[in-house]
Amino acid sequence: MSALPAWLRVEARSYSEMAKVRSVLSRLGVYTVCEGARCPNVFRCWGEGTATFMILGEVCTRACRFCSVRTGNPRGYVDLDEPRRVAEAVRRLGLRYVVVTSVDRDDLPDGGAFQYASAIREIRRLAPGALVEVLTPDFRGSREAVETVAEAGPDVFAHNVETVRRLTPLVRDRRASYETSLRVLKTAKEVGCRLTKSGIMLGLGESFDEVVEVLDDLRKAEVDIVTIGQYVRPTKSARHLPVARWVPLEEFQKLGEVALSMGFKAVASAPLVRSSYRAEDLYEMALGLRPRAVLV
């Protein structure tokens, strides 16, 4: 596949807000997926005083073929002070909207659900004005784990299907499944989460109709918010799948419009869109606080 199209190139910038965020995170020993997963929007988000925190360590028990996070066995270790430090970072940075995500932790009986709940509660305690979105793993489909997170009261519960049904065995770790992801999202609604959210990457070999099928499945699971972005290979390692194609801007726009017509409350669809892209704007749109439109 050829080099990145012009619309996927992001100018590297460094300014005072970036330095402030890095300094706070370093002193508190907390991590962000913004840098760990090489997100192209890190400059925009940090520049706006927004960050996506990664809890439960930096080692994932799964090896999805789109992700740059390190794979290994954390052997059950959990830093119980981590939720407090994340909340303290939120307080010091004065964040309005916080996304909390994590690696997969198949080595833990609850998949890390308790740590998510603790992080939500600590943020509520130390930064009561902040809105909290969680982007969770699939917890191996455990209803109890989803309930644990939901009971802590996140403003948005997110879990990504990542790709179309046909490509799931190729793209995601063998322990993940398309059906399990849909079940997690449906369960989140059933146990009281007001807003649910999911995301999909394009450029892995899917067809337009397959993406529409995913959108239909997500609506059947009562998902409110959807993000659609371009897959970019994180490294040239054999582990990471090559890009099958660079999806044109027009196709993103068309899929976004299809999603809105299906009844999603908020949609972001563009090459640079990632799970947490303009998360606060999507939240406000889902609540009817801003006009419904495809965010790009």
From Swiss-Prot:
Entry's Gene Ontology molecular function annotations: 4 iron, 4 sulfur cluster binding; lipoate synthase activity; metal ion binding
Required cofactor(s): [4Fe-4S] cluster
CDD domains reported in the protein's UniProt record: Radical_SAM
Keyword tags: 4Fe-4S, Cytoplasm, Iron, Iron-sulfur, Metal-binding, S-adenosyl-L-methionine, Transferase
Any Gene Ontology CC annotation: cytoplasm
Pathway: Protein modification; protein lipoylation via endogenous pathway; protein N(6)-(lipoyl)lysine from octanoyl-[acyl-carrier-protein]: step 2/2
Organism: Pyrobaculum arsenaticum (strain DSM 13514 / JCM 11321 / PZ6)
Binding-site residues for [4Fe-4S] cluster 1, renumbered to this chain: C34, C39, C45, S276
Domain Radical SAM core per the UniProt entry, residue ranges: 46-265
Recorded coiled-coil stretches: none
InterPro entries for the chain: Aldolase_TIM (IPR013785), Elp3/MiaA/NifB-like_rSAM (IPR006638), Lipoyl_synth (IPR003698), rSAM (IPR007197)
Pfam assignment, any one: Radical_SAM
EC nos: 2.8.1.8
Catalytic activity: [[Fe-S] cluster scaffold protein carrying a second [4Fe-4S](2+) cluster] + N(6)-octanoyl-L-lysyl-[protein] + 2 oxidized [2Fe-2S]-[ferredoxin] + 2 S-adenosyl-L-methionine + 4 H(+) = [[Fe-S] cluster scaffold protein] + N(6)-[(R)-dihydrolipoyl]-L-lysyl-[protein] + 4 Fe(3+) + 2 hydrogen sulfide + 2 5'-deoxyadenosine + 2 L-methionine + 2 reduced [2Fe-2S]-[ferredoxin]
Cited NCBIfam families: lipA, PRK05481.1, PRK12928.1
PROSITE patterns from the UniProt entry: RADICAL_SAM (PS51918)
Highest taxon of the lineage: Archaea
Binding annotation for [4Fe-4S] cluster 2: C60, C64, C67
Subcellular location, record wording: Cytoplasm
Entry keyword annotation includes Transport: no
Cofactor: record remark: Binds 2 [4Fe-4S] clusters per subunit. One cluster is coordinated with 3 cysteines and an exchangeable S-adenosyl-L-methionine.
Annotated protein name in UniProt: Lipoyl synthase
Family: Belongs to the radical SAM superfamily. Lipoyl synthase family.
